[in-house]
UniProtKB/Swiss-Prot annotation:
It catalyses: C-terminal L-alpha-aminoacyl-L-glutamyl-L-glutamyl-L-tyrosyl-[tubulin] + H2O = C-terminal L-alpha-aminoacyl-L-glutamyl-L-glutamyl-[tubulin] + L-tyrosine; C-terminal L-alpha-aminoacyl-L-glutamyl-L-glutamyl-L-phenylalanyl-[tubulin] + H2O = C-terminal L-alpha-aminoacyl-L-glutamyl-L-glutamyl-[tubulin] + L-phenylalanine. Zn(2+) binds at residues 280, 285, 316. The gene is MATCAP1. Its cofactor is Zn(2+). This is Microtubule-associated tyrosine carboxypeptidase 1. Binds 1 zinc ion per subunit. Tyrosine carboxypeptidase that removes the C-terminal tyrosine residue of alpha-tubulin, thereby regulating microtubule dynamics and function. Also able to remove the C-terminal phenylalanine residue of alpha-tubulin TUBA8. Recognizes adjacent tubulin dimers along the same protofilament. InterPro entries: MATCAP. One of its GO terms (cellular component) is cytoplasm.
Length: 471
């Protein structure tokens, strides 16, 4: 592991302190289809940088997200959807997320004070994302409204009575919009049950976060926890770690200077949540991606040849479970609220959805972002409609928990980016030598006990899951 608390912008080294407040930027991984993330960097680079050249003196290649790094014939590493957030200082290739409306969650310098983990995340537009997006805009970039800031101002000035009229860059990904135009209600009872369990115990989400997240960590404490975690996973020297105060997510993975890089949000690094984030990003996505590169189904042709199912529900479900693994209160709040929001968006206008969410989320800025997330792709939001892709988190969680007693979790990790449903089929064909299983799966009995604890905490009923997902 390489620890880097210096330059936090990834295009070039920081100049003298900016005279204007730093802008914020966040982007989702461009995964509009399920598929295998690959190991996207030369293995010769998976070493500690004992003598690192200062960033200002290095040639600056185009910064790419972890999911887009190309490596010859191997194609690109594509992980299931999650957030790539990069802080910015207004230099080339940087965009401006936009100014949130006055009120909670703003500091005088223009940065957000809202807890990073409480928000969904919206990709930057082609206009905002600059050179990278203009070359090949991903699906999630294309679905971010280009006029979102202006419509947000109108919405808040109307006291939440205006339905935003969104505009998008062209061409719109119509095939993707058609694929995700219908919301599922299969697990709506579970979603509502999880949300209400949190509010019943803590009153509000903000109280839940304060009670279960623990204190914010100092840089030294973060370095110590990250260093120990990387050693546990055998990843020391493979991943560059950087700290930032400008990320909107808890953490982000990307490839910078041909090295896998994990950026951690200083303002969201809480005592009891940091290791969960590391289990999500490193212990799940990273290790499964490394293992996947060794398998004969590491590319699209191989997946077709072996008849593999989509990996995304399993990938995101597993990562989401690992995020809360070993917590005293392992509530699946975010996955449940995203599922609920999309389910309601399919039946409501934007303003109706915003008002409906008030029963669960008081912060207007947070509600706005959940609503925009669910209404992506719509122009006239006075009409019912949704973009349902984010339901994959809870969907994957519930399916894994339903079959938790029969899934071979170490093998599921070793086989790479595959669905739990394909494990038995792939067992004879997997390349298992030198694959990597996260340390928290070594004691499988304890791991399974934690899954039972997650079931109980979130009030998930075994018999009901059996009826919803029969064998």
């Amino acid at each position: 592991m390489v620890l880097d608390s210096g330059a936090q912008a990834y295009d070039q080294a920081p100049p003298s302190p900016p005279t204007s407040p730093p802008s914020l930027r966040h982007r989702l991984k461009p995964s509009d289809r399920d598929g295998p993330p690959l190991y996207p960097w030369s293995q010769s680079l998976a070493l500690p940088l004992a003598l690192a050249v200062p960033p200002a003196l290095q040639p600056q290649p185009e910064q790419q997200p972890f999911s887009q790094m190309l490596l010859g014939h191997r194609g690109h590493m594509r992980r299931s959807e999650s957030t790539y957030s990069v802080n910015s200082t207004g230099r080339r290739g940087r965009g401006t997320l936009g100014r949130p409306p006055p009120g909670r969650g703003r500091n005088p310098g223009g940065g957000t004070l809202r807890p990073a983990a409480s928000l969904p995340h919206i990709a930057k537009t082609q206009r905002d994302a600059g050179h990278i997006a203009s070359k090949s805009p991903c699906m999630l970039v294309a679905l971010r409204p280009t006029n979102m800031d202006r419509e947000r101002d109108k919405f808040f000035q109307s006291h939440y009575t205006y339905n935003p009229q969104f505009e998008y860059q062209e061409p719109m990904p119509t095939a993707v919009l058609e694929k995700y135009c219908e919301a599922s209600g299969q697990f709506i009872h579970q979603a509502v049950g999880i949300i209400e369990a949190v509010l019943e115990k803590f009153g509000t989400y903000e109280h839940f976060e304060a009670a279960t997240g623990g204190q914010l960590l100092t840089k030294c404490q973060i370095w110590s926890i990250v260093r120990k975690y990387m050693q546990k996973e055998g990843c020391a020297g493979e991943v560059v770690v950087q700290l930032s105060e400008d990320l909107l997510s808890q953490a982000v993975m990307m490839v910078e200077n041909s090295r896998p890089t994990l950026a951690i949000n200083l303002t969201g690094a809480r005592q009891y949540w940091l290791e969960g984030m590391l289990r999500h990003e490193i212990g799940t996505h990273y290790l499964r991606g490394v293992n996947n590169a060794r398998q004969p189904w590491h590319n699209a042709e191989g997946r077709l040849r072996y008849g593999l199912r989509p990996a995304n529900p399993t990938e995101e479900g597993l990562a989401s479970l690992h995020s809360v693994l070993f917590r005293k209160q392992p509530f699946l709040w975010r996955a449940a609220l995203l599922y609920y929001t999309i389910h309601r968006a399919a039946r409501m206008s934007f303003r109706q959805l915003f008002q409906d969410l008030e029963r669960y989320v008081q912060d207007a800025d947070v509600r706005w972002e959940y609503c925009v997330r669910a209404k992506r792709g719509q122009t006239d939001t006075s009409l019912p409609g949704c973009f349902s892709k984010d339901q994959v988190y809870l969907d994957g969680i519930v399916r894994i928990l339903r079959h938790r007693q029969t899934i071979d979790f170490p093998l599921l990790t070793s086989l790479g980016k595959v669905s739990y449903e394909d494990v038995d089929h792939l067992r004879p064909h997997g390349v298992l030598d030198n694959t990597r299983v996260p340390h928290f799966m070594q004691d499988l009995a304890r791991y399974r006990q934690q899954l039972e604890h997650i079931m109980a905490t979130n009030r998930l009923d075994e018999a009901e899951l059996g009826r919803l997902l029969p064998d």
